[in-house]
Swiss-Prot record:
GO function terms (MF aspect): ammonium channel activity
Record Pfam families: MFS_1
Residue positions with a glycan: N79, N466
Similarity field: Belongs to the major facilitator superfamily.
Main location: membrane
Keywords: Cell membrane, Glycoprotein, Membrane, Transmembrane, Transmembrane helix
Cellular compartment(s): Cell membrane
Function recorded in the entry: Efflux pump that might be required for efficient secretion of terrein or other secondary metabolies produced by the terrein genne cluster.
Identification of the protein by name: Efflux pump terJ
Amino acid sequence: MSRNDVIDDEVHGVHGEYDDSSTLTGSHEDLDVKRPQSLSGEIAFIVVVCMAQLVSQAGLGQVISILPVLGDSFGIGNNMSQLSWFPAAYSLTVGTFILGAGRLGDLYGHKLLFTAGYFWLAIWTLVAAFAESSGPVFFCCCRVLQGIGPAFLLPNGMAILARSYEPGTRKEMVFSAFGSTAPSGFIFGGLVSALAAKYQSWPWGFWFMAILEAVCGIAAIFWVPRTPTPRRETTHSLWARMDIAGCVTGISGLLLFNVALNMAPGARWQDPYIYILLIASLVFFGLFGYIERKAVFPLIPFSAITPDISFVLATLACGWAAFGVWVFYGWEFVQNFRGISPLFACLQFSPAAISGFVASFTTGLILQKLPASVVMMISAAAFCTADTLYATMPIAQSYWAQLFVSIIVMPWGMEMSFPASNILLSNAMPQEHQGVSASLVATIMNYAISLGLGFGAIVETDLNKNGTDLLRGYRGAWYLGVGLAASGIILTMFFALHEYRKSVPMKNKAASREEYLA
């Protein structure tokens, strides 16, 4: 029995009653994606898929870079509890809808959902550009709907790559290329918006991004290979195969919890609806867990999530929540306290793109040489170092002293955690669950950013003395990021201990076998 067959039995045999003939899928051979054979075709394919990560992160950077401009445009000034909603609303829907989008890709083909994601993102980016005269509420709604586009792009794009390459160095380098576009995408989105705000008006940046996303969607039609859909079985209904009950309860729980968390700073925990939303989210989480245990085709195949994967995902969540705090308050710091324009701020943050590129491909080279626990520990240390440099940074200081170093260090946390966690899950999951595998990583990464913004806003508003001491609030948020990243370091230590305990019996068994043969 092959390794994939063993994993397939673990995933589908939750109740011990389903074999390959009664599952959603056919053979693994039928599911393999045939990537372009020519070098130019393969490069074009990789570029189109990597652009999904770039435009997804650009959607975050295009508002964070011009938050003061948006505050003035919508008449809300520097109210951080309201401004934080513009990036948080986007990350919220990216993180919550990814799981369902990955399952749809598993059912109906990853290319179809991937291409649709580009066009959906283009449409709502275009609509958001017309929100200038409609107010912040309409703009925030557009941001929510914008986030659904990357929710379809990211898991299905990663699933396409995972199904196109066998485990090995080539696959790791391709995933590293995909991950390397995250920092550059953020900077690119910020630069586009900053240029538009300086020379025209901020909606021009959204119009440009909408055109780029539409072009990528057209390119995906021609350059992304066909992804065969699994053989349909008629034993179970679409409701069961899609796990609609799990989708509804899981997404509802994630949405309500995050909305409550991000609205709490503005309400200062005094309005009862905050607690109602929190309680409702916990109820939905409980229902989700119960439904998934009973589901024939669970949205999250918990049986396939080993302790190793759990440690990796928990570390990923801590690190990316720390990143959310780092990037949001870092950008606000340089503009509000150092008087830097959005355009110049983009230039100051631009070394992150180069650092991210180097970090990503370095990670691709060392993943086969270092244990995953070591890679994740380095990642967590980078997250912690970057936030610590921000938290202790004075206003009057050279750019090269702490700000530059922090900007160089942070991408190593991002780029080491992203491909490592993706490759671990991709290799551990069978082909038909690559969408779910990719969804878990992308869900945690993006949802953690939104959670980090929510927790950061709670700390910041509690410490800023009713807006009279913004710097104190910013530092409090950064120290929260330090704590989150430090938690990730502790988790990786437990992960390393777990790996060591697993390796000892295997080494003893190998030694005994050698003695016997001798």
